């Protein structure tokens, strides 16, 4: 588990995601996709919730590479998830591309939010060449 409290933690999570993807045999493009998604989620946790945690797992089997990341925080939650998932929506004056972009970078994307925090689970899945 990687604690997310400040910018250096986001960098550490991004590098760990890239290293996990590389060790799993993913190409540079997929390594970058996974690392970028983790960076976006980590930044949200630090910026909007004053921190959280990131757990990276390799759930691969004989048929496919399957990498999972779970990023959680204990912030105030997201008031309107549907709106937050729209490109361009932001409560902080940013571009509003983080969550929608992360969804596009991921093969699986799940977000749950309440007044006690937000949890985002993403996966990158690739079939192995047999």
Language-model segments: which ranges?
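Bergerat-fold GHKL ATPase/HATPase_c domain
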Residues: 1-36
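Conserved beta-strand-loop-beta-strand hairpin that lines the nucleotide-binding pocket
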Residues: 1, 42-130
């Amino acid at each position: 588990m990687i604690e997310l409290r400040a910018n250096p933690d986001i960098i550490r999570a991004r590098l760990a995601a890239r290293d996990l993807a590389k060790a799993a045999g993913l190409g540079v493009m997929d390594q970058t996709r996974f690392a970028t998604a983790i960076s976006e989620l980590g930044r949200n946790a630090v910026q909007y919730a004053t921190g959280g945690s990131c757990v990276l797992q390799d759930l691969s089997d004989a048929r496919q590479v399957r990498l999972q990341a779970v990023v959680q925080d204990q912030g105030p939650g997201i008031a309107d998830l549907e709106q937050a998932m729209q490109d361009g929506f932001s409560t902080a004056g940013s571009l509003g591309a983080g969550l929608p972009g992360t969804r596009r970078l991921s093969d699986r994307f799940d977000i749950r939010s309440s007044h006690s925090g937000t949890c985002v689970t993403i996966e990158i899945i690739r079939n192995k060449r047999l």
